[in-house]
């Protein structure tokens, strides 16, 4: 049927059940219910692969959304610590917070514009290729360049060509566009340095590598 089938009793009038035909001819039931809390994703949030997500730094308003993801691990890509609210959120919900880009001493492979190094990228990828860390969120301050670097290196590991990797990276950089140094780092990163345990790797990665 194409009309509203049924409303709940008056005491449940905040719930509406709709039974309608969609273009394919198959019935679809949609149940609308106002959430108890605002559900707001973090800045630049996007699924990357199954149970793998990316975003900017989450704040208090994003925590109800993150709870729905049932995160086990958050990779934080920055030299500075995240906000206290995020630290407390991870502690309260038993989420492992991994600092993948803390590099106070620097080094010859230091990436001066954002603190990322070959070593920190590799550490992040070692976590990402282990399904025991999932569901997993990769994030940095704005979810643009640092996160884009790690995800770009992951895409190369998956066999993507550089044009596709660059297109995805630039999709999150906003009106200022991408940084050529980021794209050069992604291109130069040694993907053979990332060890993959196939018994623990996510299925989508195994499919990409097959």
Swiss-Prot record:
Main subcellular localisation: cytoplasm
InterPro entries: PFA-DSPs (IPR020428), Prot-tyrosine_phosphatase-like (IPR029021), Siw14-like (IPR004861), TYR_PHOSPHATASE_DUAL_dom (IPR020422)
Subcellular location, record wording: Cytoplasm
Keywords (A to Z) from UniProt: Cytoplasm, Hydrolase, Protein phosphatase, Stress response
GO cellular component: cytoplasm
Swiss-Prot/TrEMBL catalytic activity: O-phospho-L-tyrosyl-[protein] + H2O = L-tyrosyl-[protein] + phosphate
Catalytic residues, chain numbering: 140
Enzyme Commission code(s) on record: 3.1.3.48
Keyword Hydrolase: yes
Record family assignment: Belongs to the protein-tyrosine phosphatase family.
Role description: Putative tyrosine-protein phosphatase required for protection against superoxide stress.
UniProt name for this protein: Putative tyrosine-protein phosphatase OCA1
Organism for this UniProt entry: Kluyveromyces lactis (strain ATCC 8585 / CBS 2359 / DSM 70799 / NBRC 1267 / NRRL Y-1140 / WM37) (Yeast)
Lineage of source species: Eukaryota, Fungi, Dikarya, Ascomycota, Saccharomycotina
Gene this protein is translated from: OCA1
């Amino acid at each position: 049927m194409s009309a509203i089938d049924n409303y709940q009793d008056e005491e449940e009038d905040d719930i509406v059940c709709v039974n309608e035909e969609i273009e394919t001819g198959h019935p679809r039931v949609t149940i609308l219910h106002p959430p108890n809390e605002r559900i707001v994703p973090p800045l630049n949030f996007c699924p990357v692969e199954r149970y793998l997500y990316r975003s900017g730094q989450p704040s208090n308003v994003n925590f109800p959304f993150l709870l729905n993801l049932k995160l086990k691990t958050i990779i934080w890509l920055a030299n500075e610590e995240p906000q206290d609210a995020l630290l407390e959120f991870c502690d309260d919900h038993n989420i492992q917070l991994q600092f993948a880009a803390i590099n106070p001493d620097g080094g010859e492979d230091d990436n001066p514009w954002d603190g990322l190094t070959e070593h920190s990228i590799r550490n992040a990828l070692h976590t990402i290729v282990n399904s025991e860390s999932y569901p997993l969120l990769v994030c940095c301050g704005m979810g643009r360049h640092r996160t884009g670097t790690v995800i770009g290196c992951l895409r190369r590991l998956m066999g993507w060509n550089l044009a596709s990797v660059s297109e995805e990276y630039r999709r999150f950089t906003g009106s200022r566009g991408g940084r050529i140094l980021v794209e050069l780092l992604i291109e130069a990163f040694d993907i053979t340095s990332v060890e993959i345990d196939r018994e623990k790797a996510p299925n989508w990665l195994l499919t990409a590598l097959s």
